[in-house]
C-alpha cells in the first residue's frame, strides 16, 4: 500500500491522469477483463509465489492484441552478477508465457544485463 500511495502522489504532482494504480494479491492483478493494453513486469515474474495464477490473471485482463513485456536478468549470461534465483532464461519465459496462450512477438536485446521479451494476446 505504501508504494501505491507514493505512485499516486508522484502521478498527481505531474498531472498524469491516464494511470490507475491497483493493489494486487499474490494470485490476481485484480483488473477487469479485457481492460489493459500493456502489462510490463520488470524483475518481477521470477519473484512471484504463484506465477501461473498471476499470468492467467494478466492474460484475462489484456484486451485482444494487448501485450505483456517480461524484463528479467539474463540467466544465459554468466557475466550477469545476479544470483541465479533472480534470473530467467528467454527459453523459460517463452515456455511459460506461451503455455498461457500468449504469442511471442519479439525479444529486445539492447539492455545491458536483462532481456525484454514481448508477447501479444491473440
Task: Give residue ranges: language-model regions.
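A short beta-strand submotif of the Rossmann-like class I SAM-dependent methyltransferase core
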Residues: 37-42, 54
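Core SAM-dependent methyltransferase catalytic element
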Residues: 100-122
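Conserved class I S-adenosyl-L-methionine
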Residues: 4, 67-94
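Class I SAM-dependent methyltransferase SAM/SAH-binding core
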Residues: 1-29
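A short glycine-rich, Lys/Arg-flanked "PGG" loop and its adjoining helix->strand segment in the class I
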Residues: 52-67
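Short helix-capping segments at alpha-helix termini
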Residues: 12-17, 64-65, 101
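A short His-aromatic
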Residues: 44-47
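A short acidic, Gly/Pro-enriched loop at the edge of an enzyme's catalytic core
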Residues: 29-39
